[in-house]
A protein has these predicted regions:
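Active-site beta-loop-alpha junctions enriched in small/polar residues
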Residues: 20-22, 45-47, 73-77, 102-105
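N-terminal binding-site loop/beta-alpha segment at the start of enzyme catalytic domains
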Residues: 1-68, 95, 118-121
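Short beta-strands and strand-loop turn motifs
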Residues: 14, 71-73, 98-102
Length: 122
């Protein structure tokens, strides 16, 4: 597996599985099979409506969470919702994500960015 080193020193796999347009059942199976096949980067977003299934696929795979690079995205409608990140983590059934993005620069994305900055734990 090839990796790219991010500015904060974290290594991110160059190849991963995206879960856009996957039903919850398909997302769970795809994540499980991808991790069993050696993938270590999983991408999802709250707009995909499959975060719970992604979390189940990760748990089912038996791969240690610290060996997975998990990324998600916040949708503009939750940029100013103070509980948005905690709710995302609950849906994914994980204590952290490795990369969190603003899905698009719409709505109050400046507040969304500030909220994400406050949530960073090193």
């Amino acid at each position: 597996m090839e990796y790219v080193k991010l500015n904060n020193g974290v290594k991110m796999p160059e190849l991963g599985l995206g879960t856009f347009l996957l039903s919850p059942a398909d997302a769970e199976n795809a994540v499980y099979n991808a991790l069993k096949s050696g993938y270590r980067l999983i991408d999802t977003g709250n707009a995909y409506h499959n975060e719970r299934a992604v979390g189940r696929g990760i748990k089912k795979s038996g791969v240690k969470r610290e060996d997975i690079f998990l990324e998600s995205k916040l949708w503009p409608t939750v940029y100013t919702k103070s509980a948005a990140i905690d709710e995302m983590l609950e849906r994914l059934d994980t204590p952290y994500v490795d990369l969190l993005l603003l899905h698009q620069p719409a709505g109050d994305y400046i507040e969304g960015y500030k909220m994400m900055e406050k949530a960073v734990k090193v």
